[in-house]
Amino acid sequence: MPLWTAPSTSAVDRVRAAHRENVGAESAHVASAPATWALIGEHIDHYGGIAIMGLADIRAAAAVSPRSDGLVKVHLEHTNGDTVKDEISLEQVSALAAQQQPGVDSEGQPIEPPAPEGAIAARLGGIIYTMINRQLLTRETAGADITVVNDIPDSTGLGAAAAIDIATALALLGTADDLHDAPLRARIAEVCSQAVGTFARFPALRARHSAALRGAGDSITIIDYADGSVTQAPHMINKDIAAFALAVPGDVDSAEAVAEIRARERFIDAACRAFGTPSLRLLPDAPQRVLEWLAAVHKVHGTENQPTIAQATAWLTFYSEETERAEGIARALRSRRGTELFPLLTQSQSALATVYGFNSAEKLAQLATARGAVASRSAHAGTSSAVIAYVPSARATNFAADLAEDGLLVIPLSAGSPAITED
């Protein structure tokens, strides 16, 4: 397979033309957002750890125009030529939101709602619904035509869906005066993550939305959920190190992994409710106390829909140790000690497979290392079998050519820029 290259014309120009062709009118507003890649932290995002993200120079663009019939119609064009058309009414979106409200059983225990299964129209319609309810859009909003051109290859762990979320949200906001202000961008990221968690089939990764909106092209974004800070550190891709996303072409069956991720998130949420804490990371002596609480839950309510003590021990161990690794990587980035990064990334990949139980990318990571990468780590273990490989610049060209010749999808990662409106 040849080395992946971006289309020669911008996604913004193509989405304007596609919207004109499919809707029959010019778009009201257009916005674009970058691909995002995780250095570390995508599986401790919900725990309240540290997520470290980069932006890539591949983008998704969205064009919107208003409707008056209560429908959200989506036309999505992928970089591989696939086209998706989907629609939903805002009334249906409201009904889906109601289904996600938790109940309580006869013993006072919360009843978890079914996992959302929404496709692209429900996902983007959910963003509109949430923006209305969070007073980012007027309640007079009565639907939208949304056209999306996505240049980010799917199943590569580069956050195509999150980029579409952000591009759509910014386009819906149009020419608002304060779209570049950090407080509003933080609010937009929060709204997108909330909507995805309520309506979409794949769980939300908050760090992608935050990085796409608040990152910077020439630096790495560090999101620390202990205090909610979003800061920048010197970029690790430089004259000495190149980075690539590597993936096996084709769709990945991630249904089982998605269910596993949701089960772990429910466990974290239940423990946080039990201890009255916003995140387990902020709970003193969390592993011991949470395991004692879980044992009590087993004793009183049984083990149905609950992890075993062994499973919970492994998860909590991973969360704690991965947060420590993320802290070490953040320190190394800030002090420009690049050689300290790669052992920590290798340890993280090993822990994902052996401790956390997500080994979908393990063989590809091993192959990349064998071919000359100084480190390779899953792009998003569970939902993708892709890896991010870090290669000395002197070997980068041969590395990419060899793996492309083996039939892998090889995407060079260059620094991107944050999401913007394109009006």
Where are the language model's segments positioned?
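Gly/Ser-rich oxyanion-binding loop with an adjacent helix/lid
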Residues: 1-30, 34-53, 108-238, 247-249, ...
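A short, compositionally biased micro-patch
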Residues: 55-57, 67, 151
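FabD-like malonyl-/acyl-CoA
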Residues: 162-165, 386-390
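C-terminal nucleotide
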Residues: 1-36, 40, 61-114, 224-376, ...
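A general alpha-helical scaffold signature found inside nucleotide-binding enzyme cores
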Residues: 57, 122, 183, 187, ...
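Catalytic-core region of right-hand nucleic acid polymerases
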Residues: 52-55, 60-62
